[in-house]
Amino acid sequence: MPTNRAAWQPAKKAPLLEVKAAPYPPPKANRIVVKNGAVAVNPIDWLIQSKGDIMFTWLKYPFVLGSDVAGEVVEVGKNVTRFQVGDRVLGFARGTDEKVNDSSEGAFQEYTVLVPDLTAHIPSSLSFESAAVIPLGLATAGAGLFQQDQLGLQLPTSPARPPTGQTVLIWGGSTSVGSNAIQLAVAAGYEVFTTASRKNFEYAAKLGAAKVFDYRSGSVTQDIIRAFKGRTSAGALAIGQGGAEACMEVLDHVQGRKFIALASYPVPQEEPKRLVMLRTIIFFVSWIISFKFKGLLKGIKSNFIFATSVNHNGIGKALFVDFLPDALRAGEFVPAPDAQVAGKGLESIQTAFEQQKQGVSAKKIVVSL
């Protein structure tokens, strides 16, 4: 049996990961084990590290975090037929999901257990580093666009579906979630309006956005409203601080679907110095009540996205099994944003956290293993 090592979150709010031995996770009947060639980091990883008593309260430490992996299949459960040892894959590691809560399914280790329906074959031309940028962004975008409790759009296909005649607004097009959402929406037959900084206009357009707007412009919402004239809204996906409020302003003045899928959580502009947990909860609840009430007055509904929900409703299979392998092979879906490699080895994951905290634009921080 192989030996395994992991970058453990040793305790709640412990400031540094600890790299040490971890159990090798043999697969259950409906699981596979992947030897990771690369992993990606996401803001949720270092937010759990710094605010562990506010979110993901069910985690029992020490714990292995991480959601994005790419590597080679080394073991398959007896009921798995779609994968074989040696297959190159990417996968959404769902260890932090409340219904899973299992370090063996965390990304930040040498070997990770994956669910076949959240795993996709990748072409030989695609590096593990590039593939690792996809899983969580794909799942989050897919949940927001296609789940029935979200926008409920028709599913993507490869090749893309014919145009529906509807337009979806994606606020934050150069983010990881936004980059995936643009491509998914286009593959599903929707026109995409998105926002980005001016330096990322070309980037968003290459992913398939029909129109890109400068989110820093003081007239951005009015510019989008004017562009929607004569068009029918399919709803909005809001990513990043301030995106939800801006999407509400736009949807209040356009025809069609008035629903916002919320991919980001509001955070206080200033970190509370005392009673941190209580004050943060009060801020969060107050924001939700205020936002929902404003939406009620305008006839606009909204819902927060939980990426792991795609594992429980068939959307995960539709994305990772039915769509992504063919789309990657045909070049109709590209890994985006580009990978920015922070280093090699599990010891580099904490460094990757720090790099991402500083902010990146149209990039995703990746660690080679």
Swiss-Prot record:
Q: Domain Enoyl reductase (ER), which positions? A: 13-367
E.C. code: 1.-.-.-
- Could you tell me the membrane topology recorded for this protein? Single-pass membrane protein
EC main group: oxidoreductase
Q: Which residues are glycosylated?
A: 79, 101
Which Gene Ontology MF annotations are present? nucleotide binding; oxidoreductase activity, acting on NAD(P)H; pigment binding
List its uses: As colorants, MonAzPs are widely used in various food products for centuries. Moreover, MonAzPs also possess wide-ranging biological activities such as antibacterial activity, preventing hypertension, lowering cholesterol levels, causing hypolipidemic effects, and displaying antiobesity and antitumor activities.
Report any Pfam family annotated for this entry.
ADH_N
Instruction: Give induction info.
Output: Expression is positively regulated by the azaphilone pigments (MonAzPs) gene cluster-specific transcription regulator pigB.
Q: Does the keyword DNA damage apply?
A: no
| Keyword NADP belongs to the record | yes
Q: What does this protein do?
A: Dehydrogenase; part of the gene cluster that mediates the biosynthesis of azaphilone pigments (MonAzPs), a complex mixture of compounds with a common azaphilone skeleton very widely used as food colorants. Within the pathway, pigH might be involved in the late steps of yellow pigments monascin and ankaflavin biosynthesis. The first step of the pathway is performed by the nrPKS pigA that forms the hexaketide precursor from successive condensations of five malonyl-CoA units, with a simple acetyl-CoA starter unit.
Q: Which family does it belong to?
A: Belongs to the zinc-containing alcohol dehydrogenase family.
What's the protein name? Dehydrogenase pigH
* Lineage, opening ranks: Eukaryota, Fungi, Dikarya, Ascomycota, Pezizomycotina
Which gene codes for it?
A: pigH
